Swiss-Prot record:
Protein name: Large ribosomal subunit protein bL34
Domain of life the protein comes from: Bacteria
Gene Ontology biological process: translation
Pfam families: Ribosomal_L34
Region (Disordered): 22-44
Keywords: Ribonucleoprotein, Ribosomal protein
Lineage: Bacteria, Pseudomonadati, Pseudomonadota, Gammaproteobacteria, Moraxellales
Record GO cellular component, one term: ribonucleoprotein complex
Family to which this protein belongs: Belongs to the bacterial ribosomal protein bL34 family.
Gene Ontology MF terms: structural constituent of ribosome
Amino acid sequence: MKRTFQPSVIKRKRTHGFRARMATKKGRQVLARRRAKGRHRLTV
């Protein structure tokens, strides 16, 4: 059985990156929530 985590910087950025978050309304809500909480890193 292969491992489920096969790291790839491209996939990581495309699914969880800042621009990916900004692209949807829900993604912007995620960023707003993380800003309100005071996270130093909003995205990966």
